[in-house]
Amino acid sequence: VENGGYELEKNYADFWMPSCTKDASSTGSYAWETTYAGKWYDGKTWKAGQGSLSKEIVLNLKLNSTHDYNGNGDGNTFSVYLGPRNRCATDICIASGWGACPVTPYFVEQFRNDPRFNACVWSCKDAGFSADESDSYEYTGYYTRKYAPMCFADGTRQEVGFQLGEQHQNITYYQDYTIMRYADVLLMHSELNGTADGLNKVRARVGLEPEDYSIENIRKERAIELAFEGVHFWDLMRYGKDGSYAAQEIAKAQNGAKVKNGGVETATKFAVDNFTSKKGLMQIPKTQITLSGNVLTQNAGW
């Protein structure tokens, strides 16, 4: 923690390319800054470049825009899920996608006033565009930003890798995926040692006042600091190993959440009993149980 050479980025939003992109209306052109390898637009063309790795990165999965459907290259194939179902206003750099992972109203209500919120989430209304709600499922009006697909700002809305002729747009997003960063380590250190030191270093980065140590404060801080980075679900699972704590927290966010399916307003439902009966675990494939000579036993509830 102290001698590994790691440190927090000065600005929280600068860690993710979609979060730190400058507004074209104010800069005249996009200068897409990033703390890792990326590309930027100089107002005329796209340029490839190898940025220096952020000192906040502990473990990083490097990705590029040369992936193809034959398995060549190492492209980002998940960002396409996170874009909205139709094209956005031209003053936002986020490309269209498959409309998955909409942000729940519960998250918005909890963290709207946190200084990290706009680096994590973008609002259709604030971006000045109306979604085609008839083509969306579980639409809430909010999408994740950190790993969103990126595109040109000229109104064509084409994804960058596709426009550059680098294979198919669904598999050529070049944003890296960070498996672990230093902020996560600091919060884990606080949790393990029962002190507020790491917690308050993370809070100080975004100008928040110090807090006393409590497991509740640690859990809330992790929920916003590491939002939409593939961490929160596993935090919920480890907080209660039988899946009951995770079920309780997921139900708060998903039971009765107002969404639109095909343009029709409805409310989501979360099957708590189904989740807890399986302790939140997936089914072990029967083929793997057979291959193990029945050493493996099926998870409860399946």
Regions inferred by a protein language model and the residue ranges of each:
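Long, intrinsically disordered, low-complexity segments
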Residues: 20-80, 169-172, 177, 203, ...
